[in-house]
Amino acid sequence: MDVYKILTRQQWAEVVASGQFNGAAIDLVDGFIHLSTARQLIETVRRHFRSQVDLVIVGIDTERLGDGLRWEPSRGGDLFPHLYGSLPVTAATALIDLPMGPDGEHQFPPGPWH
């Protein structure tokens, strides 16, 4: 099963260079890396990445995350995947551009989130 992380293209370049992602500012404050399921992804982007450009969707294989992956209640009581520890670049299964449309909304390409 894949889960997803939204990153800037620059953050992804840093992940590739270092071999792992230790978290964005909010992840570091909360003590875990915030991830989303396909069903949760569009709302996550709307709430937390509105108007941010140069974003990518990183697909992540949950089987490669080990026991640091936990499913915990969050928005509306829905269970969200949280990763306690670093995200290894080797867990990535896909890198998908998330462009901004002329209406100021992110334009999700075809995928499991629709």
Model-derived regions, located:
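Conserved, structured core segments of small domains
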Residues: 1-114
